[in-house]
Curated annotation (Swiss-Prot):
Function comment: Catalyzes the phosphorylation of the hydroxyl group of 4-methyl-5-beta-hydroxyethylthiazole (THZ).
Gene: thiM
Protein name: Hydroxyethylthiazole kinase
Binding residues annotated for substrate, in chain numbering: M47, G196
UniProt-listed InterPro entries: Hyethyz_kinase, Ribokinase-like
Classification via SUPFAM superfamilies: Ribokinase-like
Record: residues binding ATP: R123, T169
Amino acid sequence: MDTINQRIGEMLARVRATRPLIHHITNLVVMNDTANVTLHVGGLPVMAHDVEEVAEMVTHAGALVLNVGTLSPDWVESMLVAGRQANELDIPIVLDPVGAGATQLRTMTNLKLLRSLHIGVVRGNGGEIGALSGAGGEMRGVESIAAPENPLTAARTLAQTYRTVVALTGARDIITDGERGFIVSNGHIWLTTLTGTGCMATTMVAAFAAVERDYLLAAAGGLAMFGLAAELAAEKAHGPASFKTALFDQIYNLTPEQVAAGARIAELEW
């Protein structure tokens, strides 16, 4: 795994050197935090939602984030327009299917995006991935309260069905393209005390995907760095508020060498 860890460190170095624009069509709850995370990891954020400009904006982007946390018909149309342009230009799309499984509207909207666009990475929790794969799982609002019985099978099924990379995040993160896969063990329980940390993780994945065509490895790298930052932040924090501040500081201050040394990634065995 040393070579994989080295490649992850090199990806972070490329993000910092090239400062890719990450175009978000995202939810109102996390917009400010995900913009800041994009800046701290080394990218440039833009939150452009209007259907009249998204196709033009995405032409400048290194990656496109589609996040359905605060759904509206206008924004879904913008996601489809931006996504088609991203596909035309071979720009990676990272989908965050917030709340899939909680309501029929959320589930069907995410399935429409998956069927209409080629999605590079789907980053979701166990309940969301279970709902989209047909494997089950339980959501309360946008929070996963029960993962599918076999999360690995759910992730693999969704990846194979839509020819995408699935990053199922939890106590340990499962990342697979349906054939290969990784387990990322970095992280901290305090991530569950803040709203929007899954959306922040999605932004990290997008930043890495903007500089790495192997989206499986990019997803593993973004999640490993985010989890490592959380571990280090928890050492300095006294509760959720100080943890959030420390998390942002750690994302900003982590070096490629530290990420390569601290990432805990194992190859999946089927």
